[in-house]
Amino acid sequence: MEGANVNEDERKYLRQIKHIIDEGDKVIDRTGVGTLSLFGLHSTYSLRNGVIPLLTTKRVYWKGVVEELLWFIKGDTDAKRLSAKGVKIWDANGSREFLDSQGFKDRPEGDLGPIYGFQWRHFGAEYHGTDADYKGQGVDQLADVIEQIKNNPNSRRIILNAWNVKDLHQMALPPCHTLAQFAVKNGELSCQLYQRSGDMGLGVPFNLASYGLLTHMIAHVCALKTGFLHHVLGDAHVYLNHIDALKEQLSRDPRPFPTVHFEGRIDSIDDFTAESIILNGYNPMAPIKMPMAV
């Protein structure tokens, strides 16, 4: 059988999918689509030797992973600026119709509120829209994470937190991937991601690749190797209209994960560009279409 035993990590993800389809509780969720859901799943993915957990049993939108992460790192919250890069993944949540439905009738289209990037770079600052100057405001958690990894790598407090209770009511969508903790052991940087809500078909494949890439980027600027991505899921769910597509994915045998490297010596997390992030050896199977629940 093709690729037998070459990618046990991806099989962990596929086993989670099967477990949810077989054993999940049927829930009528916020979107009205309905899900099968389990609470409290965990998997570990190796990041050693440049490996990144970018699924191979379907094509994952790598450009979207990269551009969204760079957008987060900039502290940006404007879906239109991400869309201008050709990445439309936040367009639905930033649409006039969706913002109005959430009570944000006075907010410009595309303004998602103080979501991930704002919390990463300006935690605690007052949010005044996408174009305000937030320089020096709030806590730059991402810079603090990197400073601690460099200067206090044994700390148990190296945490990046997007769940700011004070700001939740201003967000177009509260954070699904809420908190990442980093740890340095034997010269390797590992990340543990807590995700309160995981759309296993569409969101989780993206999140695994994104936090795998973020860990590689932070390790690079800190002159460390990479270790592992530990992924903890709260509500892990399969949308009912994804079941057939995911059963098709379950029939596929994983190929080896690709690797990632960076062009040149990059010393600051803010200096990465899409062009400096190089993906190697990605050989996925055909895409599998699944509708996004908004």
Swiss-Prot record:
Transmembrane segments: none annotated. It is an enzyme of class 2 (transferase). One of its GO terms (molecular function) is thymidylate synthase activity. Pfam families: Thymidylat_synt. DUMP binds at R30, R156, R157, R196, S197, G198, D199, N207, H237, V238, Y239. Coiled coil: none annotated. InterPro entries: Thymidate_synth/dCMP_Mease (IPR045097), Thymidate_synth/dCMP_Mease_dom (IPR023451), Thymidate_synth/dCMP_Mease_sf (IPR036926), Thymidylate_synthase (IPR000398), Thymidylate_synthase_AS (IPR020940). It catalyses: dUMP + (6R)-5,10-methylene-5,6,7,8-tetrahydrofolate = 7,8-dihydrofolate + dTMP. The active site is at C176 (nucleophile). One of its GO terms (cellular component) is mitochondrion. Keywords: Methyltransferase, Nucleotide biosynthesis, Transferase. Pathway: Pyrimidine metabolism; dTTP biosynthesis. Its EC number is 2.1.1.45. Belongs to the thymidylate synthase family. This is Thymidylate synthase.
